[in-house]
Amino acid sequence: MAKVEIYTWSYCPYCMQAKQLLDSKNIEYSEYVIDDDESAREAMVQRGTDGERSVPQIFINNSHIGGNDAIQQLERQGKLDSLLS
């Protein structure tokens, strides 16, 4: 099983969509809620590959996937399941 991590804000609709997709696949993930936590946000930015500060930011097996658009696109292309296995 893949190690999945997601950085979120509490009331972010895109974060909720990404988590719903993972939940629909019964994928366990570690969620880091970074509301008002600048050090956690900086850690997220440092881990990423594009300097992106928006959420969600998703990592699978320590590889930066991107945000909700990226994970939804992987799902539409039929590529997400292989990353998660």
Describe the residue ranges of each PLM region:
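Structural micro-motif
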Residues: 49-59, 68-69
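Short alpha-helical
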Residues: 13, 39, 66
